[in-house]
Structure formats: C-alpha cells, structure tokens
Amino acid sequence: MTIGIYGGSFNPIHQGHLALGRWLVRHTLVDELWFMVSPQNPLKPAAGLLDDNARLRLARLAVGRSQRLRVSDFEFSLPRPSFMADTLAALRQAHPEHDFVLVIGADNWHDFPRWHRPDDILAHHRLIIYPRPGYDIDNTTLPHGVTLAATPLLDISSTQIRRAIASDRAYAGQGLHPRVWKEIQACGYYTLTD
C-alpha cells in the first residue's frame, strides 16, 4: 500500500490540511494519507506550540472516521528533535509492507536542503510537493521521484488561525473543522493567556 506521510505540527489542523489529504487520496496519488503529528519541528520555534497530545486530539477530531485519512503519533516514541529522515527510516523498519511517500509543501521544498539527511530521504522515498502561496516551483527542475501535485492552492495557515483566535473574540472558527473549533473553545486553546 502507498502511504502518504504528511508531517507537521498541526497547531491546529485546519480545513486546508484536510482538503489536501482528501485530494491526494481521491486522485490516487496515495492509498492512505497519515497526518504525522510532530512533537517539535527542528526548524520551527516551540513558542506557542500546544501540548503534543492536545494537537493529536485535535487532528483525530478533524479526521474522524475517515477510512483513508489517518492520524499518527508514531513520532511521539522517537528521539527528539523529530527529523523526518529518522521517522521515515523507522517507518520502513516497522512497516516494510508499505511504500511511504513524503508529502510536503512548496515552502518546505525550498528549505529541504537544510533538512537533516535530505539525500537519504530522496534515496528511499518519493516526494509529493503541494503548492503554497508565494513559493513557485519549476516542475522541470525537480529530481527523479519528486512530483509537484496540481492540488488546489489554499491560502490558509495554522499561524493565521492562531492569531485570529488570540486577537478576535468574534472569530467563529473559519477554516477549522467544527469538532476542532468546539474543542479549541472548550479548552481555551490559542487565547492570549494560553
């Protein structure tokens, strides 16, 4: 089975993440997509990052009972910081029956040379890149095994959502799955006092 690994902080997971996952499985680029909740992205600051289990719960609420979208806490048991090269190697060892494909945004592709062991990732895995606002990718320059998917360009980010929640009492959960928004409200996540 071909499994797309979509790693991220998902702080919080939003409709753009879900739309991308649904698009990838609908267009048969992957059989399943696993949202790999990362304890800490080594290239991002930890400030404002919700607890691992809170982000995992929000992701599970968003995905619900989907048969082809899954949420994984696989990285929670790995040494920190979480490097995708290590995660993918551990996944290959734990699940040799699957073909793991890394799913990243165009913004991450621009930073990919700074990743831990990027050549190892490219040697063992195909990559699917999805468009992000402000990051152009020349499809003709991509290495073998790297595909630019023609996914819809969604201008939504977790950072925008966190800022909106913290600054606007009238924010109504735009861009969030209703179950996620309800949990964020109930727990008081992303408020100025959080």
Regions picked out by a protein language model, each given a short descriptive name:
Residues 1-194:
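Nucleotidyltransferase catalytic core that binds NTPs
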